Amino acid sequence: MEQELVITKAKYINDRAYIPLTVMATNQQQKYIDLLTSKDAEVANKEMAEKLLEEYLPSVEKILKALTSMEEEASTFNGELEKLYKSALRLTYILRVRFGTLLDFLAGEETDGAKVNALLGQTFYDFHNSVLEFNNLYALIVKGEGTYNLNSESIPLVQKGMTYWEISDVLRMPCSVNKGDTYYWTSEEGNFTLVVTFDEEGEASHVHVNE
């Protein structure tokens, strides 16, 4: 019964949160980029803060309630469900702390444009990876589905012109590490490493695999 309760909550979070929040995260980032290209950073930061507060925060708060309720079941978790719980905690931290800091920073009267840009980009990057991780575990643990990994079937799906978000969604795994504009995805077995270099527009310009 306890595991069924946890799985029910996991389904709620996945079905109600994963797709909407991922789409919103990507859309909000694009809105911010659009603002920066059409207005000065100070005006763009203020408008982005207003958009985040108005469009994003209410949805985040709903998901936080669902995630927080999972904390009550911590003592009943074991094995794979423990992984799901820890992943949910990471997502909770990203939403509650990191986005809270971002909103406070953006809403401030005085902001440093460079710091805001860096904070915004890193927050969305970490948020996307944490949601991806949770959804991947959900598919494996709750649905009993296999998950994509770096292999001969998934590698051909990665093409030039794709963004980081598109590649990680196709592989259903975040990158292992990045060095500047070059990102690395390594298979769990360690026998494949996908190396992708992105251009200034954020699209893959070079893709190759090390075996």
What kind of feature is each model-predicted range?
Residues E61, K65-T68, E72, Y93, ...:
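Sec-exported extracytoplasmic/periplasmic mature domains
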Residues R16, Q30, E54, S75, ...:
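Intrinsically disordered, low-complexity segments enriched in small/polar residues
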Residues G144-L150, P156-E211:
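A cross-family detector of function-defining hotspots
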